[in-house]
Amino acid sequence: MRITILFGGTNKERLVSVASAQALCSALPKADLWFWDVDDSVHETRRETLLKHSRPFEQAFVAGSASIGRLEEALDRARSEDRLLVLALHGGSAENGELQVMCEVRGIPFTGSGSASSNVAFDKVVAKRFVEIAGVKAPSGVPLEDIERALAQYGRLVAKPARDGSSYGLIFVNSKQDIVAVRNAAKSEEYLIEPFIAGVEATCGVLEQSDGKLFSLPPIEIIPAEGSFDYTAKYLLKSTQEICPGRFSPDVSAKLMDLALRAHRALSCSGYSRTDFIVSEHGPIYLETNTLPGLTKASLYPKALKAQGIEFVDFLKDQIVIAERRTRR
């Protein structure tokens, strides 16, 4: 079976994907590299070309090679060549289940969660319903038509795209001017609106190993440089602090780990996931679950693996075994 790292994509998170692919390429030097470009074409990519791309979070990657076809054609080739896809992809059709179902109908093994789980987790509104059934507390939603009343009631709101990642489109609602911004943004995509919750940002990974063990990784405490953990704070500002393990009390750490595990199971995730929380004065509050969290050198999940004493390459090898085993079932 030929191990192939698939990266890029047609959505806003393709820059992060390139950085994840660089980390995966370094850990899996014998893997082939396929770059999925914004026009849906797929390109075989040289290792040197990927690794010399020095500013992946800021500049678009250019494969510099001829296309092997559009994504569906590339997946047909992956099936005929007995390839296993290691997904260095994030967001959009790469994480919402569309790519996953295209692989499943062809019998192509791939890392990460399956299509059904990916689809549910990617929709923040639907995911909240699933995790709440499992006993995970999440903020109450605010209908767009009630946003003015909710702002008067709560004093501050948070609005974000219901199906997007890396905190793209995040709007803090403090005034009528912000309400106008939300309404304008909601014309092009569905927005999730919630009361602002004061507290410490936290995230907690969950890992499935090839021997069947499923457990939570050490929670991470996040202190954004500019007050919100958006794309810039995540990947561009060195002053953002990500403390792993987080400086939480033993009780709060245990609670975060339990809730992350519950969310992973409630959403039927596979392989690995990462769930984000706000630790309020009343305890951890669920925000969202990522089925393909970033795997860049600057990303949170690899930091949690390191804190757990797990080598990145061992994590990847386990995910490859899990992907192959799932396809054989």
What spans do the regions from the language model cover?
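Surface-exposed charge patches
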Residues: 26, 101, 129, 262, ...
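Hydrophobic beta-strand scaffold residues
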Residues: 109-110, 138, 157, 312
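Short small-residue beta-strand/loop micro-motif enriched in glycine and branched aliphatics
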Residues: 112-113, 167, 241-243, 297-301
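ATP-dependent carboxylate activation and anion-phosphoryl transfer catalytic cores
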Residues: 1, 250-329
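Active-site nucleotide/adenylate-binding loops and adjacent lid/helix of ATP-dependent enzymes
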Residues: 2-7, 75-80, 118-199, 210, ...
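ATP-binding N-terminal substructure of ATP-dependent carboxylate-amine bond-forming enzymes
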Residues: 1-111, 115-116, 121-122, 126, ...
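Phosphate-binding site of ATP-dependent enzymes
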Residues: 174-258, 279, 284-285
